[in-house]
Amino acid sequence: MQAPPSFYEGDTLVVAKKLLGHKLVHIVDGIKRSGFIVEVEAYKGPDDKAAHSYGGRRTDRTEVMFGAPGHAYVYLIYGMYHCFNVITAPIGTPQGVLIRALEPVDGIEDMKLARYNKTDITKAQYKNLTNGPGKLCRALGITLEERGVSLQSDTLHIELVPEEDHLSSTHNIIAGPRINIDYAEEAVHYPWRFYYEKHPFVSK
């Protein structure tokens, strides 16, 4: 079952924690690639100095952040790595949640090919398959083509995981500072990164 539009509404910190344990799904050439979300970061622009939309900054890149919740915000870092975010909060409030890491579930062979151009990989390579925002986008085939796509689409969405299979039943959720935002002054210390304690696919 796909997460309904109402799932993405409300406080961004609440939505960030709600996303943990559910599946990010991308259908590529008819093949389902997915993973359990195990690490996220919340960004609460325009007051959050770590957010692309800090100060209400509105550009072609960030325009989707000002739209309806439940859409994909994809951007490129270092000119080569894609990052996938879920838009939250009401229209006109540019906030979102970065998906930082996944535990691979469906389409793992295709994900291996996408990341390493081979399926015979080492244990270390498998652990590195989706344990970072750029890595998971490469594995799932998420690019700038997905920017602005509704997460109600057949090909890109969040799939709700039943309570009995949910990782939150076996893992504690930890809150801490976000990663790689040294430029963000006091926002560096906001405990807006949420992840499953000791999960092997958490990025750090």
From Swiss-Prot:
GO terms for biological process: base-excision repair. Pfam families: Pur_DNA_glyco (PF02245). Its EC number is 3.2.2.-. SUPFAM superfamilies: FMT C-terminal domain-like. The keyword NAD does not apply. The keyword Hydrolase applies. It comes from the Bacteria. Keywords: DNA damage, DNA repair, Hydrolase. GO terms for molecular function: alkylbase DNA N-glycosylase activity; DNA binding. Belongs to the DNA glycosylase MPG family. This is Putative 3-methyladenine DNA glycosylase. It comes from Bacillus mycoides (strain KBAB4).
